[in-house]
A protein has these predicted regions:
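Catalytic Walker B motif of ABC-type/P-loop ATPase nucleotide-binding domains
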Residues: 163-166, 438-441
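H-loop/switch region of ABC-family ATPase nucleotide-binding domains
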Residues: 199-200, 473-474
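ABC ATPase C-loop
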Residues: 155-156, 431
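Conserved ABC ATPase signature
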Residues: 138-142, 146, 413-417, 421
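Conserved ABC transporter NBD signature motif
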Residues: 58-70, 342-350, 359
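ABC ATPase nucleotide-binding domains
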Residues: 227, 231-288, 510-543
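Conserved ABC ATPase "signature" region
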Residues: 116-134, 392-410
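A short, surface-exposed alpha-helical micro-motif characterized by mixed small hydrophobic
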Residues: 205-207, 479-481
Length: 543
């Protein structure tokens, strides 16, 4: 269905191709997942399938891409609308109308489709994506998962043969992600569409993917069945990592598959059982740095969050909950950056009633898009500015950056850094004032598994140095690996609060894959399984 014939793509100003001699084939009606480290060229490959690359990027391209036998080289993206549908990472940014029904119809209007045909297709597409009841809703009022399904519906109305999705679940909570992926599976298995998607959280999609494309760091690509490709790839989701630790000859791609392998292939490691009664969170021996009572944020008549909260030094705390549950609003309220009511004390002061200089010593916040805080042309200038604004000795922020494990040249433009490097730079800038509380809003978006491991080590060092680290996230695997305590929000209220392993194991929606594989045993991560194997003489502990 899709053939890549020696495709090489070089971005403007780059000294080497991001894709180099890519050759391979994706079969018709496959669900194909594109995998690779951050910056390996996944978005570039997806963009090339509908000619967004090189048409809109200024990149140079050689080789050919054929879709259903048609050479699309040099074709304008608009001319491929009936062949390839494309949905980018931020569906809301791509909407051009106000309501769901208008958005689904818009693309067909631009293609000049007859009104009678258009009306029929709109109805069919709304039903197919399960959004018929949303037809008159304002797009901005929809949840993230609903917006994603509308974006897919809008391109499906033109009846393309191929659907390309760039990070379709990266901004979604686990349940919303499952809704979107269920809709995608329907398109593949019931409609026969060919779907190509990139997704950093492979644990969400690899169990249903028919095939995979691994983009290597040298620009080359490996095509093949999902399990075979993941066994070789340099990105290792939890089940793939677990397969290696347990010595299985083939990787498990689903929880069901892994549970069966544990029974049939072993090794049969002894693990503790979950406690019969939930263990409550205890602050014994901890120093309280945050005390909030009735902390409430409203946007007009809409209640965003209302919470009583105590947070402690040396702890890493996860804020979880569905999209719109109040996680980001709570963190902005802790920083004093949004209007709120109720009492708030951080290290003895209320950040809403102090000057900017003192506020920096109370709470720092790294937003979902860290680059929003970078506005100078070089890393060195950003570091020097942070020292001045924090009234810190020269070199303070550079020393923090080094401690975070990022050795970035002073002359590098922040816009040229990887996602992980930008996150480390912004975190160092925010830490220059030595805040008591460090807030991170969805820090794992755009990070591959190795970068998540590095981020987990960073936040643990921050906590060990005495900070309270608060992380708003949908990433249950990262939560299991990096946090001590988990607070779940729903409609602005705290509905669960306790040790991470207790809260995560109590809810299927927030359980990491390893916990599901070994349920009812008390284990959250591959590292815990590896340690148990080593303790029982069944395997060596990781170096």
């Amino acid at each position: 269905m899709i053939e890549f014939d020696n495709v090489t793509i070089t971005q403007p100003g780059a000294d080497r191709p991001v894709l180099d001699g890519v050759t391979g084939r994706i079969r018709e009606s496959d669900l194909c997942v594109v995998v690779g480290r951050t910056g390996s060229g996944k978005s570039t490959l997806l963009g090339a399938i509908n000619s967004l690359v090189p048409a809109t990027t200024g990149a140079t391209m050689s080789g050919r891409i054929l879709i259903d036998g048609r050479d699309i080289t040099g074709t304008r993206p608009r001319e491929l609308a009936d062949l390839v549908g494309y949905v980018g990472q931020n569906p809301l940014a791509g909407f051009v109308t106000d309501t769901v029904e208008d958005e689904v119809a818009y693309g067909m209007e631009q293609l000049g489709i007859a009104p009678s045909t258009m009306r029929k297709r709109v109805e069919e597409t709304l039903d197919l994506m399960g959004i018929a009841e949303l037809r008159r809703r304002q797009l901005v009022e929809l949840s993230g998962g609903q917006q994603q399904r509308v974006a897919i519906a809008a391109v499906l109305a033109a009846q393309p043969r191929v659907l390309v999705l760039d990070e379709p679940t990266s901004a979604l909570d686990p349940n919303a992600a499952q809704d979107v992926l269920s809709a995608i599976n329907t398109l593949v298995y019931d409609v026969g569409l060919t779907v190509v998607l990139a997704e950093h959280r492979l644990e969400r999609v690899m169990h249903t993917a028919d095939s995979a494309v691994w983009l290597r760091s040298d620009g080359r690509a490996v095509f093949g069945p999902t399990a075979d490709v993941l066994a070789r790839a340099d990105v290792r989701p939890p089940l793939v990592e677990l397969s290696g630790v347990l010595g299985w000859p083939s990787v498990a791609t689903s929880v069901r598959n892994a549970r069966r392998k544990v029974q049939d292939e072993g090794p049969h490691v002894v693990l503790p059982d979950l406690p019969s009664e939930p263990v409550a969170w205890s602050d014994a021996g901890l120093t309280r740095v945050v005390e909030a009572r009735g902390l409430t944020v409203r946007y007009g008549s809409q209640l965003a969050v209302s919470a009583d909260l105590d947070l402690h030094a040396g702890n890493v705390v996860a804020l979880m909950g569905r999209n719109g549950s109040g996680k980001s609003s709570l963190m902005w309220a802790l920083q004093g950056a949004v209007a709120s009511t109720g009492t708030l004390s951080i290290a003895g002061s209320d950040p809403r009633r102090v000057g900017d200089a003192e506020a920096r010593t109370l709470v720092s916040l790294v937003p979902q898009t860290p680059s929003d805080l970078l506005y100078l042309p070089s890393v060195g200038e950003e570091l020097e500015q942070a020292d001045r604004e924090s009234h810190a000795p020269p070199g303070t922020t550079r020393a923090i950056l080094t401690r975070l494990g990022a050795d970035l040249p002073d002359d590098r433009n922040p816009r040229d850094l990887s996602e992980g490097q930008r996150l480390a730079l912004v975190l160092a800038i925010q830490l220059a004032a030595r805040p008591a509380v460090v807030c991170l809003d969805e820090p794992t978006r755009g990070l591959d598994y190795q970068m998540k491991h590095e981020l987990a080590a960073i936040v643990r060092r921050l906590a060990d140095d005495g900070a309270c680290v608060v992380i708003a996230t949908h990433d249950v695997e990262f939560t299991a690996q990096a946090t001590d305590r988990c607070i779940v929000l729903a409609d602005g209220d705290v509905v669960a609060d306790g040790p991470t392993r207790v809260v995560c194991c109590a809810s299927p929606g927030f359980s990491p894959q390893v916990a599901k594989v070994f349920h009812p045993h008390d284990v959250l991560t591959v590292a815990e399984v590896s340690s148990a194997l080593a303790a029982q003489g069944l395997a060596k502990a990781p170096a």
